[in-house]
C-alpha cells in the first residue's frame, strides 16, 4: 500500500515509485517501542522539476525535533528523486544501496526494473564507503569526531558509551563483508540478535573495537576475491534511468 506522504507536505504523491522502512527496524535492531519510524522512498518528479531551473533532489520531514529527541510515535521521512538516488547508489552509498534489498512497503513497475538488476549498482570499490561510514561511527563513539548526541546521553551514562553508534559500526562492517562476498545485503541483518545485544550494552567497548577490527579485516579480504566488477557500468545505469523517466512521463498526467 502506498504510504501517504502528502500529509507531510510532499507535493508529488502520485509520482512515488517505491517506499520502504529504514533505520533500526530495517536492520532488525529495533528495541521494542522505543524507536521512531524511518520512511524512505523514491519518486520521479515532473519534467520541469528535474530538467528545469527549479530542480528537485529530495524531500525531508520529521514529526520529531523535540528537546528529548524522537519518540516511538515520531516519523522521519526521507524521499529522493530516482536520479539523486541512482547517483548515490552508483557511488556505493550504504543507505542508498539498502533500497535495493530492503523489504518494500510499496513498489511499482518502474522500480521493479531497478530492483531486478541490483548488480548494476555494485562494485568492489563500494567497500570503501561502507568502511568509511563505519570508521566515522567509531570515531563518534570514541569522542574523536563531532559533538556528543545529547538525545542519547542516557546510553552513555548507563553503558559508558553510545551503544547505538556501536551497533552501526558492527552492522556496516558486516554489510561490507557480505556485499563483497555475495553481492547483496540481507535485510533484516542475519546477526540482528547480536546487534540488539550491542544496543542493550551487552558488549564492552573493548569487545566492540576488537570485533570491528576483525570484521574490517574480513571485509577487505573479501574485497580482494570479490566476484563484483571493479566499477559500475555507468552507461548502463544512465540508459536505464533515461528509459525509466521517459516511460514514466509518457504515462503520467503530472
List the predicted regions and their residue ranges.
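An N-terminal structural lobe/cap that precedes and organizes the functional/catalytic core
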Residues: 1-106
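Intrinsically disordered, low-complexity regions
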Residues: 13, 152, 192-195
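Short, surface-exposed, charged/polar-biased interaction segments
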Residues: 40, 58-61, 103-106, 110, ...
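Generic structural signal for hydrophobic core residues of well-folded globular domains
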Residues: 43, 89, 173-176, 180, ...
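Generic secondary-structure boundary/loop-capping signal
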Residues: 47-50, 56, 158, 182-184, ...
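A generic alpha-helix propensity feature with a strong bias for hydrophobic helices
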Residues: 48, 97, 121, 230-232
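Conserved NTP/Mg2+-binding pocket subregion across the NTase superfamily
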Residues: 63-176, 187, 197
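Structured mid-to-C-terminal alpha-helical surface segments
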Residues: 125-127, 131-134, 138, 144, ...
Amino acid at each position: 500500500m502506498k504510504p501517504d506522504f502528502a500529509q507531510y507536505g510532499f507535493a508529488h504523491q502520485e509520482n512515488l515509485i517505491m517506499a520502504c522502512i529504514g533505520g533500526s527496524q530495517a536492520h532488525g535492531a529495533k528495541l521494542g517501542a522505543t524507536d521512531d519510524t524511518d520512511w524512505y522512498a523514491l519518486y520521479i518528479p515532473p519534467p520541469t522539476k528535474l530538467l528545469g531551473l527549479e530542480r528537485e533532489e529530495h524531500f525531508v520531514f520529521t514529526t520529531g525535533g523535540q528537546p528529548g529527541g524522537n519518540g516511538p510515535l515520531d516519523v522521519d521521512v526521507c524521499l529522493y528523486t530516482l536520479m539523486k538516488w541512482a547517483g548515490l547508489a552508483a557511488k556505493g552509498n550504504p543507505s542508498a544501496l539498502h533500497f535495493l534489498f530492503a523489504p518494500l512497503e510499496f513498489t511499482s513497475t518502474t522500480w521493479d526494473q531497478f530492483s531486478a538488476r541490483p548488480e548494476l549498482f555494485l562494485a568492489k570499490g563500494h567497500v570503501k564507503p561502507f568502511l568509511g561510514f563505519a570508521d566515522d561511527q567509531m570515531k563518534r563513539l570514541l569522542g574523536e569526531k563531532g559533538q556528543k548526541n545529547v538525545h542519547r546521553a542516557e546510553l552513555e551514562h548507563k553503558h559508558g558509551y553510545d551503544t547505538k553508534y556501536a551497533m552501526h559500526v558492527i552492522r556496516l562492517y558486516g554489510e561490507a563483508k557480505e556485499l563483497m562476498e555475495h553481492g547483496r545485503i540481507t535485510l533484516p541483518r542475519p546477526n540482528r540478535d547480536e546487534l540488539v545485544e550491542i544496543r542493550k550494552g551487552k558488549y564492552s567497548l573493548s569487545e566492540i573495537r576488537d570485533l570491528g577490527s576483525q570484521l574490517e579485516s574480513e571485509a577487505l579480504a573479501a574485497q580482494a576475491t570479490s566476484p563484483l566488477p571493479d566499477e559500475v557500468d555507468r552507461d548502463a545505469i544512465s540508459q536505464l534511468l533515461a528509459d525509466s523517466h521517459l516511460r514514466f512521463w509518457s504515462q503520467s498526467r503530472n
